């Protein structure tokens, strides 16, 4: 018999406003503010209404120092948001190689998958990110992996019309 969901505590307006300022700190890259709050006991894996963690917001918006700060306080680098996306997939989508390097340095699985089975390599291929495709493959990403629908990185590049990564992946997989 399925268990009933746990009740969600009601939060007052002041608490909700404070939480939004915390998420804004991650979005804007305010690593000093994040560090202060984390040092006071704020959970490193705090998530907003969309399931975006502090790390997801910092990494998606390209704030490496803020991401490094949150990771230093134990943030889970593979925590998915409610859409099933990971920080690594977000960085691949945005084309942020330095963020990808940081996440991999902190133990992110290069083959980690989003809820739909897409890997960061597939995201990079879809959006014509040749430098990131090369880097991820060099770090062990499988260019023949398939997502939940059976699409490979090459198929994803074809579907999105990403000509450079199509050519790159054709050279790699034959």
Regions found by a protein language model. Give the residues of each.
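Ankyrin-repeat-protein effector appendages
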Residues: 1-22, 106, 138-139, 148-151, ...
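Alpha-helical segment of the N-proximal tetratricopeptide repeat
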Residues: 17-39
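Ankyrin repeat A-helix N-terminal signature
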Residues: 24-29, 57-63, 90-96, 123-129, ...
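Conserved ankyrin/ankyrin-like repeat signature
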Residues: 33, 65-66, 98-99, 131-132, ...
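Ankyrin repeat domain, specifically the short helix-to-loop turn at the C-terminus of the second helix
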Residues: 35-43, 68-76, 101-109, 135-142, ...
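Ankyrin repeat boundary signal
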Residues: 46-47, 77-80, 110-113, 145-146
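Alpha-helical adaptor scaffolds
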Residues: 60, 82-105, 111
